């Protein structure tokens, strides 16, 4: 998660850069060591259209991610100038706290407790830039993320842990990640056409976000579109979860429980939850698989006991005849009256008579002239 927040804050820092340049830098950061080294070399040789501050910041980010990248004199001079007013005792204290922080959250809590000034933050950045091998990747990522967050904070108003631009960039990243997992989910939910349509929408939205990310006018529209796509992705993910519970309950219980089956379930659950963009960790996925497995076993036992009870009631206690009579009465409630009518019709045909009157009604008194007589 720390790496994703770093990417989001980096993208937020580059919101005023040309979309093609921003895409190239983010792709290099997420593309591995070789891609990042190539991008750092391009930045150092000023082959990318970046301003001086943007170029040095991106080089610092890339070197802290991959210490194999050689330092750039321009970035080192900028850091030395920013920390020139800091006392040596403060620098030693900061370095001790950084090594004791342990991880990304430790760096965050450290900065919040100390309420660091700009020169103190720059001292941390200078440490991870000049001596990256002395610190763990979590410390380096946490330091750079906090630094970028402070830089983004100066250009906008926000009160959350992630800057507003960083939060939007994080949502865009989640939409991109969801679009890559939709194809895997389509096979589980049986919604191939809907999944294909949703994937096209997410890809179009990602392209739109890439070109209009730095625009304050387009931000509300982008967030509304992202929210709509996230809702549909979440709905498909929930549907896939329901399908998975059914599959696990009725297919895995017919096979002996083994580690192979559990790993298969874990893979399905991880692929499914990638659509809702909140991936299970291994423990949660394992426990959820065991819960579904237990639910399937209980369901099978209940059905088996129910079938045995019904067989005993039918063969031993002779209740099936009564059930058949109840079913017959329920399906054809007027069968008795129909049999009586058929018998009466046959009797009349045999006697050759018309149907007798069922009520004793005397004829109406009319005269020969058709006048009613009282």
UniProtKB/Swiss-Prot annotation:
For whether the record's keyword set contains Ribosomal protein, the answer is no
What are the annotated glycosylation sites?
270, 281
UniProt entry keywords in alphabetical sequence: Disulfide bond, Glycoprotein, Host cell membrane, Host endoplasmic reticulum, Host membrane, Ion channel, Ion transport, Lipoprotein, Membrane, Palmitate, Phosphoprotein, Signal-anchor, Transmembrane, Transmembrane helix, Transport, Viral ion channel, Viral matrix protein, Virion
Record-annotated membrane-spanning stretches: 239-259, 289-309
Membrane is among the record's keywords: yes
Query: Could you describe the post-translational modifications of this protein?
Result: Palmitoylated.
Please name the GO terms of the biological process aspect recorded for this protein, alphabetically.
monoatomic ion transmembrane transport
Q: Under the GO molecular function aspect, what terms does this record hold?
A: channel activity; structural constituent of virion
- Phosphoserine is found on 337, 362
Outline which residue ranges sit on the Cytoplasmic face.
1-238, 310-374
Q: Which InterPro entries does its entry note? A: CM1, CM2
Q: Extracellular side of the membrane: what ranges?
A: 260-288
Family membership? Belongs to the influenza C protein M1 family.
Subunit comment: Homodimer; disulfide-linked. Homotetramer; disulfide-linked.
**Entry protein name:** Polyprotein p42
Query: What broad taxonomic lineage does this protein's source fall under?
Result: Viruses, Riboviria, Orthornavirae, Negarnaviricota, Polyploviricotina
Name the encoding gene, please.
M
